[in-house]
């Protein structure tokens, strides 16, 4: 029976960002796709629980246990990559593959000053569906996500933008993401870690060696952006399969 592989999306997205790679994983892994608390169809964390990467990971671990899965391989993109790394630290992941993970910067980002882009997005929400049907407009809207936004279908692009606008867990998770950093020191050596960075990722730069867990396998994914599942589904699928095939240390 294939080994379980949990896929975790990034900030403002939902599990559907993995749709392009799912057919390529079929039969190779028992794929589990969950929305993080406060995103997609998932309820936010309880009041008073800060939506840090570690706490989001704890919620996803509990959801996996409810499905009879104790320790899946875990792969995540952006904030989801950081969540996956925290699941590995806690002993809840057989391996971790993090694609352009957040949190590996050297110091907390702090809150971004200036205009609230999501507030503007909410005002423009009625126009999103029509805008994503116009290829040049769709490419402009989605250029943050992908190196080749023209490869993102209109329906998927609309879902990406509306998910970012509507996610009730966005503000809290974004605030926590900008307040904390990932700490690589003391990371369990028995958890294989792969960090893959998109060559054309303009949101998150490649982490310095000192910011990665010891023994991390680091890859540069050519000709893809921050959320590369539409840029090159085959490359992403191979990266996930290879990362989840590395045997854990005994």
Model-derived features: where do they sit?
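Active-site loop/oxyanion-hole signature of alpha/beta-hydrolase fold enzymes
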Residues: 20, 32-75, 79, 237-238
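Conserved alpha/beta-hydrolase catalytic His-Asp/Glu region
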Residues: 98, 130-188
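Hydrolases whose catalytic domains are alpha/beta-hydrolase-1, hotdog thioesterase
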Residues: 83-87
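Conserved loop-alpha-helix segment in the C-terminal half of the alpha/beta-hydrolase fold
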Residues: 23, 192-224, 230
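Flexible "cap/lid" loop of the alpha/beta hydrolase fold
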Residues: 89-127
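Conserved HGGG/HGGXW glycine-rich cap/lid loop of the alpha/beta-hydrolase fold
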Residues: 1-44
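Conserved alpha/beta-hydrolase "nucleophile elbow" surrounding the catalytic nucleophile
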Residues: 9-11, 72, 76-81, 198
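Catalytic active-site module of serine/aspartate enzymes centered on a nucleophile-bearing elbow/loop
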Residues: 214-250
């Amino acid at each position: 029976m294939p080994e379980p592989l949990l896929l975790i999306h990034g900030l403002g997205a939902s599990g559907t960002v993995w749709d392009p790679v799912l057919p390529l994983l079929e039969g190779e892994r028992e794929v589990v796709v969950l929305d993080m608390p406060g995103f997609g169809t998932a309820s936010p964390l309880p009041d008073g629980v800060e939506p840090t990467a570690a706490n989001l990971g704890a919620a996803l671990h509990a959801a996996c246990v409810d499905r009879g899965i104790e320790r899946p391989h875990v792969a995540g993109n952006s904030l989801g990559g950081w969540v996956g790394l925290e699941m590995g630290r806690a002993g809840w992941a057989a391996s971790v593959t993090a694609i352009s993970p957040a949190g590996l910067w050297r110091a907390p980002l702090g809150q971004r000053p200036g205009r609230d882009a999501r507030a503007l997005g909410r005002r423009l929400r009625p126009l999103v569906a029509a805008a994503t049907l116009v290829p040049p407009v769709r490419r402009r809207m989605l250029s943050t996500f992908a190196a080749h936004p023209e490869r993102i279908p209109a329906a998927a692009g609309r879902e990406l933008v509306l998910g970012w606008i509507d996610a009730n867990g966005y503000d809290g998770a974004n605030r926590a993401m900008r307040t904390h950093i990932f700490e690589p020191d003391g990371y369990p050596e028995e958890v294989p870690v792969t960090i893959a960075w998109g060559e054309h990722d303009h949101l998150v730069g490649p982490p310095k060696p000192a910011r990665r867990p010891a023994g991390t396998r680091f890859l540069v994914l050519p000709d893809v952006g921050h959320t590369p599942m539409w840029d090159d589904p085959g490359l992403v699928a191979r990266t996930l399969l290879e990362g989840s095939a590395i045997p854990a240390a005994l």
